[in-house]
């Protein structure tokens, strides 16, 4: 069996460092590993419209923003297929068929759906498309016969529901769909990077994001405003690293090379943490180090983004070619699904040439 990856993002805004450590960095590594036969990266505009139906221009404008961030991070169209979800109509048809295999009560129990509904204040009136988001995601994954799906921790319930749909379809119609494996980030800090205010999730509406495209001064300003240990008032006070946003970011981004380059008094992060916990290390010094680390990581990303910003027609051509390739792959899966469900009427010569028998 071919080893295939599918992953992607909703185009509702520029991508931030949470996206980077949660998924993007890993995608580039997987793409470059040579271990996979195909890598599909989807800009999920149709899913974005499920809670932005009245604001299509927001989704439309952000497709190019996400594409620029992809290319800036190192996703290579020669190695990965970058495509737009709505340009692959087979995904909608697959979603419709899978809906018959999932109950409303099962969707209601999905923790990710429940959290998203609460966050968007949809309790009173949930758009049907948004409610069926996990089914749409299952269609995306199975359409490309993905064997591995790299996701952040918050998407784990979605992937579990996808596997349920695969098992149900295969048990009803015969072995047709590929059962995907889930791949989570290895570093706990990367599972869900908090916002700079210490809140559980980065959000554009909360204004607590560091974007991949932020300029150096913006990054520095955001780092210096980060939430730390509120009880660490004086430098000599012992500090807590648990729930300390600065140290969470250092867990996700810093390497021993960064210490050698920017903070040679410490060999690694463990030494820095130990000093902070026993007292005598100020928050400003730690924040300055984090700023240097982030600038070092984000500078080449920002430079590549500036390069592609001057070549927008070329970016759209990359998406056009990728969408065409993705459509061909999804069409092949849809053909197999229709055949398994026995709704491929005009491909079935035996059916069309069968003598009429009256039904009783």
What do the predicted segments below correspond to?
Residues 157, 163-360:
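Conserved nucleotide- and phosphate/pyrophosphate-binding catalytic cores
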Residues 1-3, 346-347:
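Extreme N-terminus of proteins, especially the signal/transit-peptide cleavage junction
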Residues 7-9, 84, 145, 195, ...:
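Pocket-edge structural micro-motifs
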Residues 10, 47-48, 144-149, 207, ...:
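A broad detector of the eukaryotic-type serine/threonine protein kinase catalytic domain
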Residues 83, 149, 351:
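Residue-level "edge-of-site" marker
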Residues 15-24, 40, 45, 54-59, ...:
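Structured ligand/cofactor/substrate-binding pocket environments in proteins
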């Amino acid at each position: 069996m071919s080893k295939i990856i599918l992953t992607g993002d909703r185009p509702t805004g520029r991508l931030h460092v949470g996206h980077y450590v949660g998924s993007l960095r890993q995608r580039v590594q997987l793409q470059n590993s040579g271990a996979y036969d195909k890598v599909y990266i989807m800009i999920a505009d149709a899913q974005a419209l499920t809670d932005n139906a009245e604001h299509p221009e927001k989704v439309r404008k952000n497709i190019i923003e996400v594409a620029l961030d992809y290319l800036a991070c190192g996703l290579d169209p020669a190695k990965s297929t970058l495509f737009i979800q709505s340009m692959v109509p087979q995904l909608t048809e697959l979603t419709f068929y899978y809906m018959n295999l999932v109950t409303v009560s099962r969707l209601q129990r999905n923790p990710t759906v429940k959290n998203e509904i609460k966050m968007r204040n949809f309790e009173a009136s949930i758009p049907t498309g948004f409610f069926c988001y996990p089914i749409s995601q299952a269609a995306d994954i199975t359409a490309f016969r993905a064997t591995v799906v790299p996701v952040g921790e918050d998407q784990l319930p979605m992937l579990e529901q996808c596997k349920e749909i695969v098992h149900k379809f295969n048990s009803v119609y015969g072995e047709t769909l590929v059962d995907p494996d889930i791949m989570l980030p290895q570093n706990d800090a990367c599972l869900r990077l908090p916002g700079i205010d210490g809140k559980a999730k980065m959000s554009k509406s909360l204004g607590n994001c560091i974007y991949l495209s932020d300029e150096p001064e913006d990054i520095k300003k955001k780092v210096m405003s980060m939430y730390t240990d509120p009880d660490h008032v004086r430098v000599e006070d012992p500090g807590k690293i648990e729930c300390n946003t600065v140290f969470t970011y250092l867990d996700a981004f810093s390497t021993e090379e960064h210490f050698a380059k920017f903070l040679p008094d410490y060999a690694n992060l463990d030494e820095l943490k130990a000093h902070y916990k026993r007292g005598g290390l100020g928050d400003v010094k730690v924040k300055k180090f984090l700023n240097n680390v982030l600038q070092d990581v984000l500078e080449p990303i920002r430079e590549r983004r500036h390069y592609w910003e001057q070549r927008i027609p070329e970016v759209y051509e990359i998406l056009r070619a990728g969408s065409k390739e993705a459509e061909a792959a999804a069409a092949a899966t849809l053909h197999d699904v229709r055949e398994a469900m026995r709704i491929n009427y005009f491909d079935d010569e035996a059916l069309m040439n069968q003598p009429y028998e009256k039904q009783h």
